[in-house]
Amino acid sequence: MSEIRSLHEVKGYVMNMKQEKSQVLEAIIIILVIATWLIGVIAYAYAPDIVPIHWNLEGKPDNYAPKDIGLFLLPLINTGLYLFLYFIPKIDPNNEQLKHSIKTLQLIRLGTHGLLGMIEIWTTLSIIEASTVKPEWIFSIISLFFAFLGRAMADVKQNYFVGIRTPWTLSNELVWDDTHRFTSPLWFYSGIGMAIVSALLSFMGFGAEIILTVFLIWIAIIVIIPIAYSFKRFREEKKSIQ
């Protein structure tokens, strides 16, 4: 009896630890969302009435809006995205599956809101200083974001909102799992590599147009390969059943 009680105590301790980690992650995510609003509020007093909201590949503003929109549109989007991603496990038809991927979903949300927070800082500084931005560096940041997603997505369970959602992954759970285990290192290592390549090209004096071209080719590759892989795995599974 004492051994059974000890086993239950260990399980309870592990569950409490997981819950505490989940709560800490959720708190960090909420702080990131609130931080984007605080950045806008602090910058409001220093920003002109009309501010840039879009920059061309040369880093120069090419579209403007009142500062209420320029400073608070991204925080508003960030908040809406937080609510949407938070409630995904509750509205997804496969919500029982997603309950086993809460940590993975939290990591994906953490990376997403972290990316939006960096963009908010980047654009707000440009608004306050009335300076051009360096669009070359955004490619490195987004590449690292994909690397982060790759690291997080390996264990995400089948669902309709997050992950590699193709007709073949959604119709076969094994194909879903294999596709994500395949895609995870692909995105992680190539994301780090693309971030380094973007930084090197910028350092060597190549313009944003060249870096954008390389970046888009990379995006196409890391999107097409998992789709093709999921189709290949689906056909293999179908043949094995026949």
Where in the sequence are the language-model features?
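Alpha-helical transmembrane segments
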Residues: I29-L32, N63-T79, T132-L149, I217-W218
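Small-residue-rich transmembrane alpha-helices that serve as helix-helix interface/gating elements
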Residues: I141, I210-P226
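Short, charged juxtamembrane terminal tails flanking transmembrane helices
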Residues: K18, F234-Q242
